[in-house]
Amino acid sequence: MEMLLDLEVQLLKFLLAKRKLEPKFALMGPDLSGMLEDCDGALLIGDRALEGAKHHPELVQLDLGQDWLQFTQKPMVFGVFATRRDTPIAEVKKAHSVLVENLLRFENEPEQREKVIQWALSRSHLTHERLDRYFGEVFNRIDSNHLSGLNEFLTQACQLPNGAEFAW
């Protein structure tokens, strides 16, 4: 199931449908000016969304995560650790362990957090201050409330009747 870029598109379509809006969608490059030359609206994600909001705050009409929260009273989960079903469970557990270990280092060791921010700075147009704030806004764990939000998204917006399935 490919959802990396499609997640936001699926979420936008779902939220617009709840408002009885059914616009035509066109796949375009992430150039805000170019997108708005040809279309009435544009969906930007990630760094480009943050940059677009910074430079053109008057154009921001909808924050997908905030709208989902207002609509469902549940947080939106924008990223998960996923593997193929045929991946050996021992390898999945090993990878999960490394991810959790890195998260703990990021949360508890200021120098590790700074390394991550510096890495992100080298790949983004965002400022150190904005990246530091961003990493403080992102929740990197899934609790029961987030799982409930994820399952509602998967069942309602993606029509996956079973919701999230876990290896263990």
What are these regions (language model features)?
Residues M28-I117:
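Pocket-lining segment of extracytoplasmic ligand-binding domains
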Residues M1-D40, I45-A49, S148:
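Bilobed "Venus flytrap"/periplasmic-binding protein-like clamshell domains
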Residues A17, M35-E37, E107, L121, ...:
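Alpha-helix boundary recognition
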Residues P88-Q156:
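Secondary-structure end/capping motifs
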Residues L160-W168:
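Conserved C-terminal helix/tail region of periplasmic/extracytoplasmic solute-binding proteins
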